[in-house]
Curated annotation (Swiss-Prot):
Family assignment from sequence similarity: Belongs to the universal ribosomal protein uS9 family.
Protein known as: Small ribosomal subunit protein uS9
Pfam family, one: Ribosomal_S9
Keywords: Ribonucleoprotein, Ribosomal protein
Record-linked Gene3D superfamilies: 3.30.230.10
UniProt-listed NCBIfam families: PRK00132.1
Amino acid sequence: MNGKYYYGTGRRKSSVARVFMQKGSGQIIVNGKPVDEYFARETGRMVIRQPLALTENLESFDIKVNVVGGGETGQAGAIRHGITRALIDFDAALKSALSAAGYVTRDAREVERKKVGLRKARRAKQFSKR
């Protein structure tokens, strides 16, 4: 990436995304692949474009993303968080609109650990009276 770029780190579940944003034509590259090729589901692509659509910058920036860890949903959420932070780096005035939509706050929900003596995190073995 040549010239001025804007950076944002996004996290969601166990995914971490590093987002590099530069003035351009609206091309989004995730781990070397176009976003439409990387994310099979439409929901992932939609989630990624939300902050850009909100700020009316869908075709103003070329975005290059490196994302590691987690699954499809977690990675999409991490990229959205990173794009939001990069947009704030570009123009701090956008923060209020992005914050009102809930994109600035990191979603802190994580998988709850499995406990000893239970089948899952909270699911106990079936109880039989007789």
